[in-house]
UniProtKB/Swiss-Prot annotation:
The keyword Transit peptide does not apply. The gene is nuoD1. This is NADH-quinone oxidoreductase subunit D 1. NDH-1 is composed of 14 different subunits. Subunits NuoB, C, D, E, F, and G constitute the peripheral sector of the complex. One of its GO terms (cellular component) is plasma membrane. Its main location: membrane. Pfam families: Complex1_49kDa (PF00346). Coiled coil: none annotated.
Length: 369
């Protein structure tokens, strides 16, 4: 009988498939994965310690750089934590603008994730560019509102830094008209491509019990069939005023996770349409004029969490009464969602690791901080 020997190979930290500087120490028997050990820390920037040396407002642009795909969502969670700590109220119009920006971010993130997944399977560049097509239109909207495309620094305590410009909503309506056909076409790429189906169906299965035990959230958890979404479980901002569904998968494989993201794009479009219907027409309502930006919250602590595109994003803040946080802690969904990677890869082929990792949808700036 032919004898085989297990080998240990490194994938990363500098590798095009790892979505950042991330190393996987993989034990293989031939082409089969026996074990996998993720190695973090290559992009550690001391984010939390730096935040404790800054004022509360100075930390807002730092949150942009956690998950640079989703700066609006990062801003939202941090602003909510400070507002709870300092007792700051947010005007109704500002709440609607915040939801609008975060749901646009969700569409942007998921379109990119689908493009990256197809890219990871070997369909080089063209599908990725297709996934990025509508993303560019959303970035144009962000630039209209905030002046920046990626790291927007748009939220402030008590609202947003400036109101929507006059040209914003007409351009947004044009995007909403084009989105259904775009999402349908993305879905056809998933459903009708035989190679993609072979690389995704039954690969990287994360059973619901295992998903719960690791504490994963977002599309990774919902892909395993668990309908948990912070927007429904603990409604924040004005999410309780919107009608939307929580898509879930069946078996928790790569295919389910990306079908969940496709459907979430449709649900985000539904929410945005409801935002436009309900958006209060209040001049100056984009921010609470009484809210101080150089806040000195009373002694205490606060935790705020939101449903970011990658999962549950939370900020825990402790105040000692000064203008700087005594303790600043981030609950990063990319980090938590990476923890079951070894369980998701065992028994599959080395070539499947790249696809499984891509289906988790991580950004190393958020993982390592």
């Amino acid at each position: 009988m032919l004898q085989t020997q297990e080998l240990q190979v490194n994938i990363g930290p500098q590798h095009p498939s790892t979505h950042g500087v991330f190393r996987m120490l993989v034990t293989v028997d031939g082409e089969t994965v026996v074990d996998l050990k993720p190695v973090f820390g290559y992009l550690h920037r001391n984010h939390e310690q730096i935040a404790e040396a800054n004022s509360y407002l100075q930390n807002m642009p730092y949150t942009d750089r956690l998950d640079y795909f989703n700066s609006m969502a990062n801003n939202h969670a941090y602003a909510m934590a400070v507002e709870r700590l300092a007792g700051i109220e947010v005007p109704e119009r500002a709440e609607y603008i915040r939801v609008l920006m975060v749901e646009l971010t969700r569409i942007l993130n998921h379109a990119s994730a689908v493009g990256f997944m197809i890219n990871d399977m070997g369909a080089w560049q063209t599908p990725l560019a297709f996934g990025m097509r509508e993303r560019e239109k959303i970035l144009d909207l962000f630039e209209m509102a905030s002046g920046a495309r990626l790291m927007c620094n748009y939220f402030r305590f008590g609202g947003v830094v400036r109101d929507l410009p006059p040209e914003f909503i007409p351009n947004l309506r044009e995007l909403l008209i084009a989105l259904p056909a775009y999402i349908d076409e993305l879905e056809r790429l998933l459903r009708d491509n035989e190679i993609l189906l072979q690389r995704a169906i039954g690969i990287g299965i994360l059973p619901r019990e295992v998903a719960l035990s690791y504490g994963v959230t977002g599309p990774v958890l919902r892909g395993s069939g668990i309908p948990y979404d912070v927007r429904k479980a603990e409604p924040y901002s004005v999410y309780d005023r919107f009608d939307f569904d929580i898509p879930v998968g069946k078996v928790g494989d790569v295919y389910d996770r990306f079908l969940v993201r496709i459907e979430e794009m449709r649900q985000s479009k539904r929410i945005i349409e409801q935002v436009l219907e309900q958006l209060p027409d209040a001049k100056g309502g984009h921010i609470n004029p009484k809210a101080r930006q150089n806040v000195r919250p009373p002694v205490g602590d606060a935790y705020a969490r939101i449903e970011s595109p990658k999962g549950e994003l939370g900020f825990y803040l402790v105040s000692d009464g000064s203008g700087k946080p005594y303790r600043y802690k981030v609950r990063a969904p990319s980090f938590i969602n990476l923890t079951p990677l070894a369980d998701m890869c065992r028994g599959y082929k080395v070539a499947d690791i790249v696809v499984i990792l891509g289906s988790i949808d991580i950004v190393m700036g958020e993982v390592d901080r």
